[in-house]
Amino acid sequence: MQRPHSTARYDHWIHEADPTARITVLTSADAERPTGDLAEGVRRVTVDDYESPAATAALFRLCAADRPDRIFVNSEDDVLRAAEARTLFGIPGLGSATALRFRDKVEMKRLFEGLPVPAVPHRELRCGADLYAAAEELGPLVVKPRDGAGSTGVRVLADARAVRRACVEDPALLTALHGGTLMAERYVAGTVHHVDVLVDGDRALLVSPSRYTSPPHRFRTDNLGSVMLDRGSPRAKLLTDTAERFVARLPEGHGVHVLHLEFLEDTSGALFAGEVACRTGGALVKNAVRHTWGIDLSRASCLLSAGLWTPPEEPVPTGPPTAWLLWNGGPRPSVPAERPDWLVEFSAPKPPEGQRPPDTPVSSVDSRARFLIEGADEEQLEARLRLLYADG
């Protein structure tokens, strides 16, 4: 399955690894990828609306007519429906029971049980009284959709007065509560780390720990950036160990091949596990890992899911550590007048003709410009990120 805005060449990767493979790409009629870009012999099936139940029905029809050996997706929004297809038609890979634990943020917290870093304290919500109780028990709250992604729909409520104000000003919040679609967790003021992992069975093949320069939920007022942690630092070692233990505890035959974990560090240095997704990290995570480790997480996870990739015994860095920055809702960064060698990637996507870039991003990965830089260590990477604002 390929979302209409994706241009990744999954079919080419599979075809190169196994020229005899029969490949079908399910997408929508408005897909950005032209048919001519598909690998030789690839069948393309389109639907009018990729997000609709009709697209899921089309997937089921394909499975019923010619049961595939594997189904590959790389979007959080496709995880559950692909998993349901595997469960319904007996297809190997991530099934719906396990997939639900990666999409429901309450079930998700149970995946962290018994690990060195505990899950952030949280509560299920069904009404306004639950919100008041959560604020009394946990203090400042983050309220978010149980199945959300990209930090959309996230709000921070400081206390009971903020709870009341939010419910009065936005009655739709109560509707969401009554439908059981929201959850609350303690707001942890401090640093947010992310750990990106390539997985094969009970082994973490590659673990790359980083920290965001600003919490992702602040994308409307800040710019989202990320800096790779120094590999020998105590924080990197703890996060790597936690990620490896997380992988080792997954159920047998889980079908997960890539993970994006997020950890919260408060001002005292205490760590909590926040979220985990079984897909490649967004923004420039893939670019950063590829530059430093020489491994494309999307390609590797795709081929692992098809049984067509033999991973190296011990991945070793092929380049220096990296950091990246998105221009979201914060100050405008820019390329220095004399472009330095350490700026390894820069892009500023142009809006469709006749349209201007939106002033307000709609998610944490919605950006007007993207920068990928390299450096010797965290300190140098941070300094070079600051140089991107030197002309501002």
Give names to the regions the model predicted:
Residues G253-T267:
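A short glycine-rich, hydrophobically flanked beta-strand micro-motif that places a catalytic Asp/Glu
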Residues G114, L131, C302-G392:
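Peripheral (often C-terminal) accessory segments that flank ATP-dependent C-N-forming ligase machineries
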Residues T87-G153, A158:
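A conserved helix-loop-beta module that forms one wall/lid of the active-site cleft
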Residues V199-A204, D266-G269, G329-G330:
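Short acidic-glycine loop/turn motifs at beta-strand connectors
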Residues M1-T98, L308-T310, E374-Y389:
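ATP-binding N-terminal substructure of ATP-dependent carboxylate-amine bond-forming enzymes
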